[in-house]
């Protein structure tokens, strides 16, 4: 059992307030730092840290002292793939409820996808997102803007970047037109920003609902072949080869074949990155039999070989980061037959404990796993976060690495509860989330 509390981020910590974090195991994945020590913040910045920071005692001028009780103090997590449904589908999620869920999961920065209603393809909608974030968020809100407008012409990418877009995607749908994609890649290279693709050939997926394979055959359902993903990955990488300084990112990669193509592109020196969701390296198509529509997402859960390939991709570095594809849906959209239920699951409050299974079962070193959740996603979107460094923004979390608990969707801060991980026993609990020096979430474990 645990008691949770939240506080809105607003403008972050008061500029002159100093906070000392003591008795911490400080981990910074980028520098491979893993020490016992203390850390000092002032306002929204990290001032200093180290094993001997308060060797002569804590100065009386410190405004607040937080005892980490030998738990881990690490950079706040960064999730570059969330759907907060605002504007247009606020009955499923809002920036307020989604960011509240993120804070509970130790995520201090999220990137909202642009498939809202209307899409983030205009400056007006982009400014609305920024306004709502300032009014109602618990964490940092970034956003991708749309590659295309409703008429399939390119968005004004330069203008949208100017008002804050950290990249461009049509996520939820692929950019099917190869010429449009080539133009988008070309323009993005001039803007020094990332193009992120939902890799799916709609002609091949053909309105399928789960992975094409033994389970789809058993259930008599139309399947989505894995080649529907890899064929778009292959096409887009071919398109980018003659464009200088272009960065292409594949969202929620799910197939072994896609990883083979990505590995080859990286070996050729192309700037190709990709992400994987926790559900794609934890579950398979067989989980459909247990969880039904709660295990329906796009791309679909695939085979055990694909799942193991995702883990190998994380271990080898072919996969750059973990992202949730947090896709909230109300109960009416999910409690339907598999062929008509909505795609997607929520994931913000389970991302860290599910990912930590790879550490607890001996698959990945802790510091390598945490890299995929902190500075690596930060670098994809070019934001100066995800690190513990002097003068860096104080986005931090305190993690009880070994605390065991059971996922309970009724306790989720998200408006929606569509998760296949309900009742799963996990290990690793976020005790405090600090954004710009300000505590926005606390969990008090009640024994």
Swiss-Prot record:
The keyword Ligase is annotated on this UniProt entry: no
Q: Which UniProt keywords apply?
A: Hydrolase, Metal-binding, Pyrimidine biosynthesis, Zinc
Sorted alphabetically, which PROSITE patterns does this protein's record hold? DIHYDROOROTASE_1 (PS00482), DIHYDROOROTASE_2 (PS00483)
Q: Name one GO molecular function term.
A: allantoinase activity
Q: Which cofactor does it need?
A: Zn(2+)
Write out the similarity annotation: Belongs to the metallo-dependent hydrolases superfamily. DHOase family. Class I DHOase subfamily.
Query: How is this protein named in the record?
Result: Dihydroorotase
